[in-house]
From Swiss-Prot:
The gene is Katnbl1. It holds the Pfam family Katanin_con80. It comes from the Eukaryota. It comes from Mus musculus (Mouse). This is KATNB1-like protein 1. Keywords: Cytoplasm, Cytoskeleton, Nucleus, Phosphoprotein. Regulates microtubule-severing activity of KATNAL1 in a concentration-dependent manner in vitro. The keyword Phosphoprotein applies. One of its GO terms (cellular component) is cytoplasm. A motif (Nuclear localization signal) lies at residues 8-15. It is found in: Nucleus; Cytoplasm, Cytoskeleton, Spindle pole. GO terms for molecular function: microtubule binding. Interacts with KATNA1 and KATNAL1; these interactions are competed by KATNB1 which has a higher affinity for them. GO terms for biological process: cytoplasmic microtubule organization; positive regulation of cytoskeleton organization.
């Protein structure tokens, strides 16, 4: 009786132990079977599969990628299986698969693949192109006259500094002589508005002789194709006429200052050539009309 009890307990104890069972899915077993195929069988099988899928070239990459996944062996989650070392036969099978797939590719697909490689190299070369080479033509065009412009600006700055030195010393006669000597209309346009303001404020340090000496330069400004130059010249003429209008409009035959007679003659001759400025619309024409109204009274 005791023996039976002991036997029952032993049997129950053995039954209570739940030994883990090796679980292999259908997908894993199928893959393991495919791994056992010989290289020639595997190449023939893949060739048939690719021949069916090559009708739609877009699926070719998916087929190759799927076959690569199939060759993997998935280990069981419960047991540690010993992985077989990589053999040269498997690599040879891969090479045979690629050659077999390439042999079944249609002609247009092969041509497209070669074209894709060429386009890829072209796009790579365009992406690696440096900005300096891309805009080299633009930079060369911009910098074509850069040295000449730099020399002009340097010379202009130097001459303006000299004129500023004369102005600070209140040596107006030396300043006018310097402007007449260099004959640089750009410097004259920068300096003449300062003299115009002094004439409008009736400063005593600007003499009538200085204005007479500046008339040839003002004539060049009125004949310029730049409207800014013309406006500067007209403003100066207007300021000079208003500053010495009492002497210019005098009917006395005896003129105490000979420069008044010279100025009157030069103004009349100058305006005979530049009276067309009254036809210019806008601010320029308005100043020209005002100067013309003063000079008509002198005849």
């Amino acid at each position: 009786m005791a023996f039976d009890t002991h036997h029952v307990k032993k049997r129950n104890f053995s039954n209570s132990i739940d030994l883990p069972r090796k679980r292999i899915s259908n997908f894993t077993s199928k893959n393991m079977k495919e791994v056992k195929r010989s290289p020639k069988q595997l190449a023939a099988y893949i060739s048939r599969t690719v021949a069916q899928a090559v009708k739609s070239p877009e699926k070719l990459r998916k087929v190759l990628y799927h076959r690569k996944l199939v060759r993997r062996s998935f280990p069981n989650p419960c047991y540690k299986t010993k992985q077989s070392p990589k053999s040269g036969g498997c690599d040879m099978a891969n090479k045979e698969n690629e050659l077999a797939c390439a042999g079944h590719l249609p002609e247009n697909l092969r041509h497209d693949s070669r074209t894709f490689v060429i386009n890829t190299s072209d796009s790579g070369s365009s992406q690696t192109e440096s900005p300096s080479s891309k805009y080299s033509g633009f930079f060369s065009e911009v910098s074509q006259d850069h040295e000449t412009m730099a020399q002009v600006l340097f010379s202009r700055n130097l001459r303006l500094n000299v004129a500023l030195t004369f102005w600070r010393k209140r040596s107006i006669s030396e300043l006018v002589a310097y402007l007449v000597r260099i004959e640089d209309l750009g410097v004259v346009v920068d300096c003449l508005p300062v003299l115009t303001n002094s004439l409008q404020e009736e400063k005593q340090y600007i003499s009538l002789g200085c204005c007479v000496d500046l008339l040839p330069l003002v004539k060049s400004l009125l004949q310029s194709r730049f409207e800014e130059y013309v406006i500067v010249g007209l403003n100066w003429l207007q300021a000079v006429i208003k500053r010495w209008w009492s002497e210019l409009s005098s009917t006395s035959e005896i003129i105490s200052d000979g420069n008044i007679k010279i100025l009157k003659q030069q103004l009349s001759g100058l305006w005979e050539q530049e009276s067309h400025l009254t036809l210019v619309p806008g601010y320029t024409g308005n100043i020209a009309k005002d100067v013309d109204a003063y000079l008509l009274q002198l005849h």
